Amino acid sequence: MNLSSLPFRLLAAAVALCAIAAPASAERIKDLAQVGGVRGNALVGYGLVVGLDGSGDRTSQAPFTVQSLKNLLGELGVNVPANVNPQLKNVAAVAIHAELPPFAKPGQPIDVTVSSIANAVSLRGGSLLMAPLKGADGQVYAMAQGNLVVGGFGAQGKDGSRVSVNVPSVGRIPNGATVERALPDVFAGTGEITLNLHQNDFTTVSRMVAAIDSSFGAGTARAVDGVTVAVRSPTDPGARIGLLSRLENVELSPGDAPAKVVVNARTGTVVIGQLVRVMPAAIAHGSLTVTISENTNVSQPGAFSGGRTAVTQQSTITATSEGSRMFKFEGGTTLDQIVRAVNEVGAAPGDLVAILEALKQAGALTAELEVI
């Protein structure tokens, strides 16, 4: 693993702050679950950005940009001969994506993101020409057009040198698309409202059913599985909205999260949940450091000796081993004790990661170990 070398005391402090046990507090249903069917839908499209200051596609390497421009001009009544390939630098082929929010109606604006798909240096100062945005079913749900807002900067010289700040090949158009088609009504025709938890938990589902029945009467809600709660509701849309406005504000105490240890293998970050416990175990942990250095030696013969200068390589390999450290954990050892034991000997974050992995393999870590 390529782990960070930040001081472990800082890491331990951050972990301890994240794991401070807080008393269970009541949460609203709207913060724990979402209404089934009420979600956004992804839209995607293809288009052209024009008006760039020489930072567009190099059409010799992106012929589809020229083809797209010819097709667009043809639709506008301008015919470009088939054997003519204009070398443009102020046009860029782009991919467009947006999210169609739930209950969006025709005429409402939505934001769009525009990304270069060829070799444009920057989209700064460009304008997106009218482009349709389609859903997964192939239907057009919105039309996008407008001036781009680009947070980055990029420039390229004639010799191929390039400088860029942030990502100039991606921009956004606030309110850059207009909804043209509404999604089907998810509230029509059913006598139940489904609530889907953000995290599956049988305890939370059981408590949610009890809280809803306590507020609206016995038998109002039923548990479907570890994620879903079904609630009886009227079929009239207005009455369903009124029920939901009361339902989403019902409060309950969610179940405790499962014991889990999360390790980021790239940064060395370790997050340990407050319910993590360790079975009785003893650990010896040491480290071996191998250093290889290369030195170049030059052998220079004397003047008029007729010899040749020779270059030789000399390798030096050294290995150092630190003394093993012994850790002994009694049954029920908590997060604070684990961190304190490893921290007292001045260990690095990588040492804690290795110890946790070894404990998991030995069956002494009563938690899920997740490496991301």
Swiss-Prot record:
Gene Ontology CC: one annotated term: bacterial-type flagellum basal body, distal rod, P ring
Keyword terms of this UniProt record: Bacterial flagellum, Periplasm, Signal
Locations listed in the record: Periplasm; Bacterial flagellum basal body
Presence of the UniProt keyword Signal in the record: yes
GO molecular function, one term: structural molecule activity
Entry annotated with the keyword Coiled coil: no
Function field: Assembles around the rod to form the L-ring and probably protects the motor/basal body from shearing forces during rotation.
HAMAP family, A to Z: FlgI (MF_00416)
Protein family according to the UniProt entry: Belongs to the FlgI family.
Protein's UniProt name: Flagellar P-ring protein
Organism: Xanthomonas axonopodis pv. citri (strain 306)
Lineage, uppermost ranks: Bacteria, Pseudomonadati, Pseudomonadota, Gammaproteobacteria, Lysobacterales
Protein encoded by which gene: flgI
